[in-house]
From Swiss-Prot:
Gene name of the record: ALDH2
Cellular compartments annotated: Mitochondrion matrix
Disulfide bonds: none
Protein name: Aldehyde dehydrogenase, mitochondrial
Transit peptide, residues from-to: 1-21
Binding of NAD(+), residues: 186-188, 212-215, 245, 265-270, 288, 419-421
Function: Required for clearance of cellular formaldehyde, a cytotoxic and carcinogenic metabolite that induces DNA damage.
Species, as recorded: Bos taurus
Length: 520
């Protein structure tokens, strides 16, 4: 329902679209803008612990800059404890290893039910800690969390091996066995959703998990940890550690008793994790990293739709999306009109209190990101891009940035090459389809891309030519738990979601048995 409402709202344009979205949000419960923080420790073996070091760190409300609370700071010693608990839970004969696959699915469904029960609280806590609009937390993020967990619950007893008719008097078959102890490191831009993306396939296939949550946004993941216990998962199956990348994250990536690591975050850190995994026990690695995704607007595109979708592609989630459409390529004969309309749309974007249902854009997640984005804006101006709107802070307090649009952007500019991760739109001009393919692919990234055209031949050609793990045609940011997501080149390795997402969490074992006589 939400996606249909959002698409209809986009087609109507900003003013009428907001009215439609406003009507849809009337069914959304009124949030508590100061939700109580119930859990701020480390979750190991279904119990809450202080850090071994007794250290804590503050988590901050990005709308105000005020400290929400202090959270236990896990590091190597805590990772060691969590891995030990996970390894014990994975031993042969343990309750988790002996559990029926269908029962694992039931537990995942139970977890989804508990999250749905506490949906209003979780959405409010996500908004408080992350800064994204509450209406997005409730209608988008939580909706996708529930669908992801329930999707993988259904796979628990359906992802299995095969019998193989090899020659001779033999019976041969394969088993899909869990990898073992899975280290999972999740980012701050979609804390609840990324937790679900990681937990769903890992638990459905019978693995155990040591998860490090982002230091900027630890609160919702810790609350879900308690729901995991309430759902009935055995002790040690899921362990959650708040902490910092160079300490807790590095300890997971280099741990000799961790069998796999899955990471979502920057390409820079992805390099470090790949190296640490290789230098330790050559653990399996799944990486979902950065992007600089091209969004190609052909001259025959539906102008109203393309403008609104390009705006959404860049500015959604305060621009803090790895797959954001951050290089908007527009064919030259519609360039001027597209730029004019895009600037008008950006100027109409509502920035403010994320708990206000009228707000489209909240603050950046923290001061570091705030300053980083402003630095990229400064770079764009210095390198000759034309600043058409925005360009500065949007409030005296908190980490709000004005919706910003640059025109006359050239491929060699810093803002056209590097991932900004903020509300900064770059619009580039192109002449021919062949030209734009070369320019779009001339990037170290390859996470996503989009094409807007009414010509099926152009859509097919471009979707095949673009070097990206996902290509959207006449839409953007359309996700489903059923469809895989991942990147080419420096945007990562492996896939999450869909049946493909299960492969990274299983080992395929061949068993061959000699029999007295084989019959067909």
């Amino acid at each position: 329902m939400l996606r249909a409402v959002a698409l209809a709202a986009a087609r109507l344009g900003p003013r009428q679209g907001r009215r439609l979205l406003s009507a849809a949000t009337q069914a959304v419960p009124t949030p508590n803008q100061q939700p109580e923080v119930l859990y701020n420790q480390i979750f190991i073996n279904n119990e809450w612990h202080d850090a071994v070091s007794k250290k804590t760190f503050p988590t901050v409300n990005p709308s105000t800059g005020d400290v929400i609370c202090h959270v236990a700071e896990g590091d190597k010693a805590d990772v060691d404890r969590a891995v030990k608990a996970a390894r014990a839970a994975f031993q042969l004969g343990s309750p988790w290893r002996r559990m029926d696959a269908s029962e694992r699915g039931r537990l995942l469904n139970r977890l989804a039910d508990l999250i749905e029960r506490d949906r209003t609280y979780l959405a409010a806590l996500e908004t408080l800690d992350n800064g994204k609009p509450y209406i997005i937390s409730y209608l988008v993020d939580l909706d996708m969390v529930l669908k992801c967990l329930r999707y993988y619950a259904g796979w628990a007893d359906k992802y299995h091996g095969k019998t193989i008719p090899i020659d001779g008097d033999y019976f041969s078959y394969t088993r899909h066995e869990p990898v073992g102890v899975c280290g999972q490191i999740i980012p701050w831009n979609f804390p609840l959703l990324m937790q679900a993306w990681k937990l769903g396939p890992a638990l459905a296939t019978g693995n155990v998990v040591v998860m490090k949550v982002a230091e900027q946004t630890p609160l919702t993941a810790l609350y879900v940890a308690n729901l995991i216990k309430e759902a009935g998962f055995p002790p040690g199956v899921v362990n959650v550690i708040p902490g910092f990348g160079p300490t807790a994250g590095a300890a997971i990536a280099s741990h000799e008793d961790v069998d796999k690591v899955a990471f979502t975050g920057s390409t820079e850190v992805g390099h470090l994790i790949q190296v640490a995994a290789g230098k330790s026990n050559l653990k399996r690695v799944t990486l979902e990293l950065g992007g600089k995704s091209p969004n190609i607007i052909m001259s025959d595109a539906d102008m109203d739709w393309a403008v609104e979708q390009a705006h959404f592609a860049l500015f959604f989630n305060q621009g803090q999306c790895c797959c954001a459409g951050s290089r908007t390529f527009v064919q030259e004969d519609i360039y001027a009109e597209f730029v004019e309309r895009s600037v008008a749309r950006a100027k109409s974007r509502v920035v403010g209190n994320p708990f206000d249902s009228r707000t489209e854009q909240g603050p950046q997640v923290d001061e570091t990101q705030f300053k980083k984005v402003l630095g990229y804006i400064k770079s764009g101006k210095e390198e000759g891009a034309k600043l058409l709107c925005g360009g500065g802070a949007a409030a005296d307090r908190g980490y709000f940035i004005q919706p910003t649009v640059f025109g006359d952007v050239q491929d060699g500019m810093t803002i056209a090459k590097e991932e900004i991760f903020g509300p900064v739109m770059q619009i580039l001009k192109f002449k021919s389809m062949e030209e734009v393919v070369g320019r779009a692919n001339n990037s170290k990234y390859g996470l996503a891309a989009a094409v807007f055209t009414k010509d099926l031949d152009k859509a097919n050609y471009l979707s095949q030519a673009l070097q990206a793990g996902t290509v959207w045609v006449n839409c953007y940011d359309v996700f489903g738990a059923q469809s895989p997501f991942g990147g080419y080149k420096l945007s990562g390795s492996g896939r999450e979601l869909g049946e493909y997402g299960l492969q990274a969490y299983t080992e395929v074992k061949t068993v061959t048995v000699r029999v007295p006589q084989k019959n067909s």
